[in-house]
């Protein structure tokens, strides 16, 4: 785990996680990963990997340095695309995201969102399924949990920076039928 933290990885692509995601993607057409970071999930799933690469912005990199957190070293195979641009380019049925922060929209979002965050409500308008891997303490207050239908998997085998009991996989029903 120490090495993954030093390299900016938030979740590790365990065999169990990849198997579960492959099962969730089995009937999907053109699935993609957004917020892919180093591409650890998409690479094993053999799907396009995209990321807005905001950690390359000087002000974001400086913030991470200040809080002593590593920034991601984005590999070439990760496309530099904001999440909605990736959805427009690839027209996926399913989007996979891991530890993404939602887009800041209202004052009520403070502390749980950012101006460079993902507009998950908009993504859900364009896909059939949105799979979010995250942690209850960090992602459990997302707006989409109040506005969209979802099921939850509480996997004890997801390895992340958070305590294992809070790790979750949320599977949202998109609006694009």
What name fits each language-model region?
Residues 1-26, 53-94:
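S-adenosyl-L-methionine
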Residues 28-37:
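Conserved class I S-adenosyl-L-methionine
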Residues 39-43:
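Glycine-rich SAM-binding Motif I of class I
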Residues 49-54, 134:
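Conserved acidic E/D residue at the C-terminus of a beta-strand in Rossmann-like folds
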Residues 95-98, 132:
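Redox-cofactor binding/interface segments in oxidoreductases and associated redox assembly factors
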Residues 100-103:
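Short glycine-rich anion-binding loops that position phosphate/pyrophosphate groups of nucleotides
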Residues 105-176:
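C-terminal substrate-binding/active-site "lid" region of AdoMet-derived donor-dependent transferases
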């Amino acid at each position: 785990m120490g090495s993954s933290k030093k390299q900016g990885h938030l979740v590790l692509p365990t065999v169990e996680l990849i198997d579960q995601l492959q099962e969730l993607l089995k009937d999907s057409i053109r699935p993609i990963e957004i917020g892919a970071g180093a591409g650890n999930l998409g690479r094993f799933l053999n799907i396009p990997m995209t990321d807005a690469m905001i950690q390359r912005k000087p002000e974001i990199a400086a913030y991470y340095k200040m809080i002593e957190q590593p920034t991601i070293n984005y590999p070439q195979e990760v496309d530099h695309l904001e999440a909605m641009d990736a959805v427009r380019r690839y027209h996926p049925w399913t989007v996979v995201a891991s530890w993404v922060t939602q887009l800041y929209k209202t004052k009520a979002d403070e502390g749980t969102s950012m101006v460079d965050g993902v507009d998950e409500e908009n993504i859900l308008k364009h896909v059939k399924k949105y799979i979010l891997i995250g942690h209850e303490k960090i992602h459990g207050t997302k707006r989409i949990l109040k506005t969209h239908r979802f099921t939850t998997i509480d996997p004890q085998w997801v390895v992340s920076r958070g305590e294992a009991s809070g790790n979750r996989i949320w599977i949202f029903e998109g609006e694009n039928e």
